[in-house]
Swiss-Prot record:
Residue ranges of the region described as Bridging helix: 846-858
Keyword Heme: no
Name of this chain's protein: DNA-directed RNA polymerase III subunit RPC1
Main location: nucleus
CDD domains (UniProt xref): RNAP_III_Rpc1_C, RNAP_III_RPC1_N
Cross-referenced Pfam families: RNA_pol_Rpb1_1, RNA_pol_Rpb1_2, RNA_pol_Rpb1_3, RNA_pol_Rpb1_4, RNA_pol_Rpb1_5
First-tier enzyme category under EC: transferase
Species per Swiss-Prot/TrEMBL record: Trypanosoma brucei brucei
């Protein structure tokens, strides 16, 4: 039973909601309980009994229980089927039966209480103690469950009741629904021996039976007490009320409610009758089962039944009552189950049950679905809605004065003419009118008044939600602006394909038309495409240019691409909007003809006119950057923008595509916002698609035809490779091949052949690419621009397809020791094991084609298998993390208020706003370029503001100008930065004084109103910003800034050394420097006459040293003004990157981890640096980590070699020590180091002589000799379960360091031979070296680490030569047991990141931190499984909507669970807004000032006003508190 406490809430789907006297209620808590017999009778409208024929009165289809057809009327309330929800009835059972859902609870209670007096089987002290614990208000449901289990365990151990002395045995479940009490089966384990019990019912019967048959008394322990429902009910009635709480029930609840004595019959509308054919009508399954129960009850009421038939009928009633609850009947024999019946359990659980199909996921109105197609002419945030869909979907538009005439025109158009309307709601009449009749339209249009509501069509500019399933992350549903166009498909810009994971091969998508102004506002501000350009997963652009857009941009921005005035103007017109202002830039070439470059075209796209305040400055390398110079790179691989001027480079996918944090859109989004970035993206899409159409871009066979030179190179490479492979195969067959570490000869051969054959394809591919021209070869253009394909595809098309692999191995000999019948047995040649020497151009041979299909099939199978697994991973993560959100105090909590993190991601920053590639808040290098450009503009503006040249020279010669605008010395810079970051008051004072001087100097030239002037009124000054930075920024961020300036100072020192400038203040004061540097000499020779200091009337000119200082400042301006501007800008941006309160960080983190899992495979990968060690990766490894498995497939311990001081660069010492560590770690069996074991038999003694192979031991650097072997054998014999436990110290004797003897435990000649044979069979498998749990250890390629296969972390850490502070293990459970919960959390984070890194997938580490903190929040590692989620103390409906639906509901009802803080799943199920995002605060109207803005009645009516503030739910915050919002009406 669900009992709901309610509070008033306005949830009606209108734009403006007025307070109603009978407003709908909002469920604020859920109370689960048991319906007693009296409760059922109170809810029921009539008792049901068996009826025969067509009689319905008092049957389960009685009309008083409701009706399900439109023509009938309910006899209870008099309403029809639409308005009447029905009324329940009841069935009184003739005899009680066990409740299937509470049967386990009944069993536990029977074990807890005395079967004679019904007291709990504990003493009074324990009862009082547990009562106090259970009565505590702070006891969580999970803790309460564990405490009840402890009570039951203690009571179960009691044999004799401490109250009545009754004997209590074991209560067992026999058959599906029967209990027996094995009273005499077990001897007493707690309490006194049995006392006489003359009053016991079962004892009296036993004494009577023993009097008639003495054998019964002798077999007393096999006599069982049958506990039928009547007997159990009697025991439950006798339970003292004060001890009910110890049984797990709430005070005042009777345990008898766990038994079924009365059944509640649901209303008829719940179980409507259906058609079984064309004419036949059949009852619902529930109705049929209730009728069966009535038949059994009616039969039992017949007094003529004997005991046997009565018992059989009773059991049938029990079975039918159980089948009513669950037709699968767990525990029942198969012939009794009726799985085709849909009982209560079947209607609730599984994917198609009520919880997941109807409550958690609901069907919606105002939606449409159609096929999608591309349209690059649409803006990025636009969606082409078919005209047919636009006429069907409507919006309730309220009529007001501004749109009165428009609404009248729409009403006159009607439902069939677009734009039109379908219905009108007349507010004065309170009725809705249809517009199908043309005569009514004109009449209603004339009567249309302000306040009426018109259901109008979708119109251009309306916000619609667009969604593609499966919706794996937030941006699978975004808001677009509708544009109504003809035809039948939804069309949108291809830039939006990535977030939807959509292609245009027949995909269908859904559109939803939002119905309220609140929904429109939320969709615009939270879900619009422009606001989701950056992914919340890792801060990378997810909406970006793709395919043809990239190829065209690559071509246009290439070197030597020019357009004349007509062509350039035509190109501009392709993207120019109707209201876009633009100004053509100055041509790049003026004579003999004006020509503009493609780069200038992109400059104009980014900044159409100087009036646009978007000054983009950044630098970034492209994919093919050669690192041989930046702006003069031969491949144009370095892109640079300065103040929105395209300086150098060629745009490709790394600059324009998704996932590029250093790209154009990421930087543009940072400085101009998402709206402007979307406009620029739309311009690029519209221009490039048109340009490529005119340019002509096609792919044919001629583009991939190999040249004769390429064929010659390919033949030479193949011949050389075949020769090398033949040599390897021959050396393996002759036994001359040295196996790789940890591998057999065959495995080593496979590894070497794979390596060699991979080189063939790579070399052929390199040669193929070199034969192509970037100017006219379309495949190469696509590869270079990143629009499609890779160099590997070109290699396979032109040169060689290469080696085909299945599960990372060559094609196996699966057909009679060969891969195909075409080859010889055991053939290892490349062609026989899957190597494809042909290209797609030349065509594949039959065997090559077969091998190629085998490799392709693996991908298909892998995709099909992983889909279900990754979907389940995603669902579990979402269910576990959906309740987590950022609160107003900065903590991350669930809906119950439990703290998961003190700061989200440890620093409280939003991952979506992170600009650095490693998750850092800012890209400091790009910020430096931006600040440097702005600073240069300001200085240039300052100098240019002088009226005459003499004024400019005066400014330059001014000492203050020199001190303020010349770079600090390398010795001054770091200390000044550190002082600013540490909040040093002297440094801040210097900043303030410097700003004052800059203002004075700037204002003196009349530049106070310039856009680049000093900060305007209301903006924080730099000193204030820097002081605020010290308080709120993380220590790591400040360290990053300081490290950045350290690099800049080193760069400054290199420049000053080239110029031979002083590096200290003393040298500068003394005029140091002999002007002998290479650059200084050139400048001196060139400008010597003009650099000498002269005395003149104008005050003289600057000295040569000062001129060089200015040159160094131009190259790297490390001035105080530049540094303080940079720190202030970083500070202000850092403050804006905080994660906003209410952010559903849990759901975003779950999506960020779950969505990339769909791109993984199910394979294993080689460990980094060790090719011979394969570890589990991909989806299987992710499952192991998030499930917190106790046993994983490939545990690995990484042991770094201990470094001594001064040994950092000695590789040979590294390797020697690594070999020594490996010898200590790797398990060594006696058979591996023994040369022989000889059985010695003489007249006096019998023993085994063991000879060690010291040459092998020395070669492998093993610390093993006869003494250590003796110790290991004795240690193995010391275990209780060891087969060598008969050996002791006297049985082993050491003869020498390489010889020892093992004697049998006894020297009896009759048995000694068998004893020696037994020891001889066991002795070779004794571990004599290394760690027993580690089968193999490998040294990494760099020799600094030893990797051990196993989970013996503690043993590895205790070894000499191992740096125990850096030992790492990938087994979470082992790390938790050895190092604690914090170390386990760190391993979870590292393992998930490594899993994603193996597939080149990246997510922000803050999401992984949140997942790890959730798994470890209770001090133990809890897996994201059905059992782990249950231990995380989730609400009942949350767990029921996940798995084991009925079990959770039964347990909640039995324990009287109360859920007061509704979670996300709970809120969705009960129809309440989820407590996240915009629902995490209240908007409250300040009534004291609302009268000045709007009339009082309008303010109340609209529910909004001019001034609002936030408040936590049910807690008001004064207006003066922090977090005040202002909502401006317009």
């Amino acid at each position: 039973m669900l009992k709901g406490s309610s509070s008033t809430s306005f949830l009606l789907p209108q734009q403006f909601v007025e307070p109603l006297p009978h407003a709908p209620v909002e469920i604020s808590a859920l109370h689960y309980g048991l319906l007693s017999r009296n409760d059922v009778h109170r809810l029921s409208v009539l008792p049901c009994r068996r009826v025969v024929g067509d009689v319905k009165e008092y049957g389960v289809n009685d009309a008083r229980l409701g009706v399900c057809d439109r023509l009938s009327i309910c006899e209870t309330c008099g309403l029809n089927s639409i308005e009447c929800v029905g009324h329940p009835g009841h069935i009184d059972l003739e005899a009680p039966v066990f409740h299937l859902g509470f049967f386990t609870t009944v069993l536990r209670i029977c074990r807890t209480i005395c079967k004679r007096c019904s007291h709990v089987l504990l003493d009074d002290t324990e009862i009082d103690y547990y009562k106090r614990r259970l009565s505590s208000s702070s006891l969580e449901p999970l803790q309460r469950t564990m405490l009840i289990k402890t009570i039951q365990t203690d009571a179960y151990k009691t044999r004799v009741c401490l109250k009545c002395g009754g004997l209590n045995g074991v209560v067992r479940r026999v058959r599906p629904m029967r209990l027996v009490h094995e009273k005499y089966h077990v001897e007493p384990r707690r309490g006194e021996g049995p006392r006489e019990n003359p009053g016991g019912f079962f004892d009296a019967e036993l004494r009577t039976a023993c009097a008639y048959n003495k054998v019964v008394g002798e077999c007393r322990e096999f006599v069982h007490d049958f506990l039928d429902p009547v007997r159990v009910r009697q025991l439950f009635l006798a339970v003292p009320p004060g001890e009910v709480i110890l049984l797990g029930l709430a005070p005042g609840v009777s345990p008898t409610d766990l038994l079924m004595t009365t059944l509640l019959v649901p209303p008829v509308p719940v179980r409507p009758r259906g058609c079984a054919g064309t004419t036949t009508v059949r009852d619902d399954d529930l109705t049929a089962q209730y009728n069966d129960i009535l038949v059994s009850t009616d039969t039992m009421q017949d007094g003529s039944l004997d005991a046997t038939r009565y018992t059989e009928t009773w059991e049938m009633l029990q079975m039918r009552a159980a089948r009513l609850l669950d037709s699968s009947l767990p525990g029942f024999p198969p012939n009794v189950r009726t799985s085709d019946l849909k009982s209560y359990a079947q209607r609730l659980k599984s994917k198609h049950g009520r919880f997941r199909c109807n409550l958690s996921g609901k069907r919606v109105d105002y939606s449409g679905r159609s096929v999608i197609s591309p349209d690059p002419n649409l803006d990025v945030d636009e969606l082409a809605v078919p005209l047919h869909v636009a006429r069907v979907l409507t919006y309730p538009q309220r009529v007001f004065k501004a749109n009165h005439e428009l609404m009248r025109r729409l009403v006159r158009n009607g439902p069939h003419v677009h734009p039109g309307a379908t219905t009108v709601y007349l507010a004065q009449e309170g009725s809705k009118k249809s517009l199908k009749n043309e005569r009514d339209r004109h009449r209603l249009a004339a009567r249309l008044a302000v306040g009426d509501i018109v259901e109008r069509h979708v119109m251009n500019g309306d916000l619609v939600l667009f969604n593609r399933q499966p919706s794996l992350h937030r941006v699978s549903m975004m808001a677009h602006r509708a544009r109504v166009l003809p035809f039948r498909t939804f069309r949108f810009n291809e830039c939006c394909c990535a977030p939807y994971n959509a292609d245009f091969d027949g995909d269908e998508m859904n559109v939803h038309f939002v119905q309220t102004e609140k929904a429109r506002a939320e969709a615009l501000q939270l879900m619009s495409t422009a606001r989701n350009i950056i992914s919340a997963k890792n801060g990378e652009p997810i909406i970006a240019c793709t395919q043809d857009f990239l190829a065209a941009a690559y071509l246009v921005t290439s070197r030597d691409v020019f357009f004349d005035r007509g062509e350039f103007s035509q190109m501009v017109s392709h993207w120019l909007g109707p209201v876009t202002q633009f100004r053509l830039p100055i041509p790049a070439i003026l004579k003999p003809v004006e020509l503009w470059t493609g780069k200038q075209l992109f400059e104009l796209i980014v900044r159409p006119s100087p009036e646009v305040d978007v000054l983009l400055s950044f630098e970034a390398p492209t994919k093919f950057y050669t690192r041989k110079g930046k702006h003069d790179c031969a491949e144009e691989g370095y892109v640079a923008f300065l103040d929105s001027c395209f300086i150098s480079g060629r745009l490709d996918k790394k600059l324009l595509g998704g996932g590029a944090k250093d790209g154009l859109f990421a930087r543009l989004h940072t400085i101009a916002g998402g709206g402007y970035t979307a406009r620029v993206m739309s311009r690029i899409a519209q221009f490039t698609s048109r340009y490529l159409t005119n340019y002509g871009f096609s792919l044919g066979l001629g583009d991939v035809a190999p040249t004769p030179e390429l064929n010659k190179q390919k033949a030479a490479v193949l011949a050389r490779s075949v020769e090398v492979c033949d040599g390897l195969i021959k050396s393996a067959k002759t036994g001359r091949m040295i196996p790789l570490p940890g591998l057999t000869v065959k495995q080593s051969l496979e590894a070497r052949l794979n390596t060699e054959l991979s080189k063939v394809r790579d070399e052929c591919g390199t040669a193929a690419v070199q034969t192509l021209s970037i100017h006219n070869n379309t495949p190469l253009i696509m590869v270079q621009s990143g629009s499609k394909g890779s160099a590997l595809n070109i290699a396979q098309m032109m040169a060689c397809v290469g080696q085909q692999t299945v599960s990372g191995k060559r094609i196996l000999d699966a057909f009679q020791d060969r891969s195909l019948p075409h080859f010889h047995r055991f053939e290892e040649a490349p062609a026989a094991r899957g190597f494809v020497a042909n290209s797609f151009y030349s065509g594949l041979s039959p065997t090559e084609f077969f091998f190629h299909t085998m490799a392709g099939r693996e991908g298909l199978v892998d995709t099909a298998v992983k889909t279900a697994e990754t979907g389940y991973i995603y669902r579990r993560l979402m269910k576990a993390m959906e309740n987590l959100s950022v609160r107003y105090d900065g903590t991350v909590r669930n809906t119950k208020g439990d703290v998961i993190q003190l700061r989200f991601g440890e620093d409280g920053l939003d991952p979506q706003l992170m600009e650095g590639n490693s998750g850092t808040p800012l890209n400091l290098e790009q910020e430096w370029l931006s600040v440097r450009a702005a600073y240069a503009r300001w200085v240039v503006g300052l100098l240019a503001g002088s009226k005459t040249a003499s004024d400019g020279n005066a400014i330059r010669d001014n000492e203050n100008y020199f001190n303020e605008f010349i770079s600090m010395l390398p010795t001054e810079g770091p200390s000044f930065v550190e002082a600013c970051l540490n909040g040093d008051q002297e440094a801040l004072k210097v900043c303030e004084e410097q700003e004052s001087r800059e203002d004075a100097l700037h204002n003196s030239n009349g530049k106070t109103n310039d856009r680049e002037s000093r900060p305007r009124t209301g903006r924080l000054r730099r000193a204030v910003l820097i002081s605020h930075l010290v308080k709120v920024c993380s220590r790591k961020f400040k360290d990053d800034i300081q490290d950045f300036f350290v690099k800049k100072v080193r760069e400054q020192q290199r420049i000053r050394n080239l110029l031979n400038l002083p590096n200290t203040s003393r040298e500068r004061t003394e005029g140091g420097g002999d002007n002998s540097g290479p650059i200084a000499n050139k400048r001196t020779k060139k400008r010597a006459p003009s650099l000498k200091v002269k005395d003149s009337k104008e005050g003289g000119r600057v000295s040569e040293l000062r001129d060089l200082e200015m040159l160094q400042t131009e190259l790297l301006p490390l001035t105080r003004g530049m540094v303080t501007r940079f720190i202030a800008q970083c500070a202000s941006k850092y403050l804006r990157k905080a994660c906003e309160p209410g952010t559903p960080c849990g759901a975003i983190a779950a999506q960020s981890v779950g969505e990339p899992s769909t791109q993984m495979t199910l394979r294993t990968f080689h460990f980094a640096g060790v090719a011979s060690m394969s570890i589990t990766q991909g989806v299987p490894r992710l499952v192991e980590v998030i499930n917190a498995n106790r046993n994983i497939a490939t545990p690995v311990v990484t042991a770094p070699v201990l470094l001594m001081e001064g040994e950092e660069n000695h590789c040979e010492i590294f390797r020697k020590r690594a070999r020594f560590v490996k010898a200590q770690i790797e398990r060594v069996l006696l058979r591996e180091v023994v040369s022989e074991i000889v059985e010695v038999c003489s007249d006096t003694e019998f023993y085994l002589r063991v000879h060690l192979n010291m040459s092998v031991i020395t070669k492998l650097h093993l610390p093993i000799n006869a003494i250590t072997v003796r110790q290991r054998i004795l240690a193995a014999a010391g275990h209780t379960m060891s087969p060598l436990r008969m050996l002791n110290e006297d049985c082993i004797e050491v003869f020498s360091l390489d010889t020892l003897a093992v004697y049998p435990h006894f020297q009896d000649a009759r048995w000694v031979h068998f004893s020696l044979r037994r020891i001889l069979g066991l002795l070779p498998d004794v571990v004599v070296g290394g760690i027993g749990g580690i089968n193999r250890a490998m040294i990494s390629s760099n020799g600094t680490e030893v990797l051990a296969e196993g989970a013996e972390l503690r043993a590895v850490m205790n070894l000499w030569g191992v740096d125990s502070t850096r030992v790492v293990c990938n087994h979470v459970a082992v790390v938790e047991r050895v190092l604690g919960i914090e170390a386990a959390r760190r391993v979870i984070v590292d393992e998930i990141q490594n899993i994603l890194k193996a597939y080149s997938l990246s997510i922000d580490v803050r999401h992984v931190y949140l997942l790890a903190d959730l798994m470890t929040q209770r001090g133990v590692v809890l897996g994201i499984t059905r059992y782990g989620i249950q231990k995380m103390n989730f609400n009942v409906l949350t767990m029921a909507s996940f798995e084991r639906t009925t079990d959770h509901l039964y347990n909640a009802a039995a324990t009287q669970r109360v859920d007061r803080d509704l979670s996300v799943s709970d809120s969705i199920i009960v129809g309440k807004p989820v407590p996240l995002g915009t629902t995490s605060f209240d908007l409250l109207l300040d009534g004291s000032i609302s009268n000045d803005i709007l009339p009082p009645q309008r303010c109340v009516k609209r529910g909004m006003g001019p001034n609002f503030h936030t408040a936590k739910r049910h807690h008001l915050v004064p207006l003066a508190a922090e977090g005040v919002f202002r909502l401006d009406l317009f």
